[in-house]
Amino acid sequence: MRSDIMKKGLEKAPHRSLFKAMGYTDEEIARPLIGVVNAANEIIPGHIHLDRIVEDVKAGIRMAGGTPVEFPAIGICDGIAMGHLGMKYSLASRELIADSTEAMVMAHPFDGLVLVPNCDKIIPGMLMAALRLNIPSIFVSGGPMLAGRLDGKSVDLISVFEGVGAVKAGKMTEEQLKALEDCACPGCGSCSGMYTANSMNCVTEALGLGLPGNGTIPAIHAARRRLAKEAGVRIMDLVSKNIRPRDIATLDAFKNALAVDMALGCSTNTVLHIPAIAHEAGIRLDLDLFNEISARTPNLCHLSPAGPHHIEELDAAGGIQAVMKVISKLGVIQESALTVSGRTVGENLEKARVLNEEVIRPLDRAYRQEGGIAILRGNLAPDGAVVKQSGVLPEMMINEGTARVFDSEDEAIAAILGGKIVAGDIVVIRYEGPKGGPGMREMLSPTSAIAGMGLDTSVALLTDGRFSGGTRGAAIGHISPEAAEGGPIALIREGDWIAINIPEKTLTLKVDPEELEKRKQEWKPKASQNLTGYLARYARLVTSASTGAIFKD
């Protein structure tokens, strides 16, 4: 066993003595030692209950003859970090989570791992660590929050974000916003729509590293606890057979994950995270692969913010396995891929079926014939940009307008809420990329303000930053190269004409090439922000959004 190097033999008597100081018996020490990575904390609704999930995981490990050893992971709540300096740390925390998990598992050589995340950057951080370490591993998430209810309608966190813009526009009273605030998030779990956390939990299941049901079983359902126990049991089989993450997360498995991403209409953050996770497995996922798979995979679900449904309804409709069963008819699912269940994808899908065709539509009634995400290119984004096309209104799929340029999110929010943005404008927010932000803040506050003020039918937003999974509308992010690297977005001037053509996958700055070259020669980097601490190191090490914003090798 891998753990033998820290517990077996005469010379390891001091090591065993330290285990005994914590109450472990000789029998427990002799068993396979399974690390249980617990991201529980009291600042994220999706993590507030993870201690309970972890206790169930540990029960499963003991049932199967192993010894669980729990250790923590940090976690940032993107919703609470939104719209202020804290958001600079969100994406940056992904690397901290991956690195600190690696450090713990290399310092203490466990035989296997059960990783228990639930929210935005914690899931990809742990996935990166698992593939980097490549010891037997399984994921079980905390599950999604239920949607709230107000006046007989489903509401969620994005309803509250958009409510702020509605109040500013005089379309809602502060009393109505308070009522919404009080009921939109009714309890524990990852926020209830197809936002980044739930997107990544669903991707984990599709990738084969989480059991069927991992992406959708609600946090408060007993089935979630049973799933956690099953994950604890399954890790022991994976350890005994030495089945490792890279045996499961192959190129075929990543293609499966991308196909599910497209069918569901997942968060654009998957375009950052999936390539970063694949990188740890030694697999390069080019952005063009997203468009290739999108062209073959229809969008079957309109989950909040793109539509009225929430993850609890997706679960009741058959979950991720049912979605995979439908799109497998198109040949976009590699059914021979192995999963942590011990079965192949195809074997898992044998019993899957759709129970509600309004939540998971059949192929002949797909919302659109392409997937939920599109990669755009053009003279404004030579290395690519991303849009959640499933959340864009039909009238905004092809759009031209006047550039309104802001060098930070804060400046843009002030202008939007101050009534300075009008129909036909294209809001450009730059110097918010991985290096320039640094940290690539999510632009949920400005996009929610645009939607809440009723401008989402006539105003687009472009940025080298990124978006929350809760963003809807003509919101195009990850523009690469970013402004801080002298990318074309840095050369846009107030009043320039910009053309967006999502069906043609183009993003064009309509400025004469000679003029652009002149501007490029005149461009100077922004003054230093005098960064200190982790953000300073992050800005030095991070690469482009087009490569997943990973660190330089």
From Swiss-Prot:
It holds the Pfam family ILV_EDD_C. One of its GO terms (cellular component) is cytosol. InterPro entries: Dihydro-acid_dehy_C, DihydroxyA_deHydtase, DiOHA_6PGluconate_deHydtase_CS, ILV_EDD_C, ILV_EDD_N, IlvD/EDD_N. Binds 1 [2Fe-2S] cluster per subunit. This cluster acts as a Lewis acid cofactor. Keywords: 2Fe-2S, Amino-acid biosynthesis, Branched-chain amino acid biosynthesis, Iron, Iron-sulfur, Lyase, Magnesium, Metal-binding. GO terms for molecular function: 2 iron, 2 sulfur cluster binding; dihydroxy-acid dehydratase activity; magnesium ion binding. It comes from the Bacteria. One of its GO terms (biological process) is isoleucine biosynthetic process. Its EC number is 4.2.1.9. The active site is at residue 468. Its cofactor is [2Fe-2S] cluster; Mg(2+). The modification N6-carboxylysine is found at residue 121. [2Fe-2S] cluster binds at residues 119, 191. The keyword Coiled coil does not apply. It catalyses: (2R)-2,3-dihydroxy-3-methylbutanoate = 3-methyl-2-oxobutanoate + H2O; (2R,3R)-2,3-dihydroxy-3-methylpentanoate = (S)-3-methyl-2-oxopentanoate + H2O. Mg(2+) binds at residues 78, 120-121, 442. Belongs to the IlvD/Edd family. Functions in the biosynthesis of branched-chain amino acids. Catalyzes the dehydration of (2R,3R)-2,3-dihydroxy-3-methylpentanoate (2,3-dihydroxy-3-methylvalerate) into 2-oxo-3-methylpentanoate (2-oxo-3-methylvalerate) and of (2R)-2,3-dihydroxy-3-methylbutanoate (2,3-dihydroxyisovalerate) into 2-oxo-3-methylbutanoate (2-oxoisovalerate), the penultimate precursor to L-isoleucine and L-valine, respectively. This is Dihydroxy-acid dehydratase. The gene is ilvD.
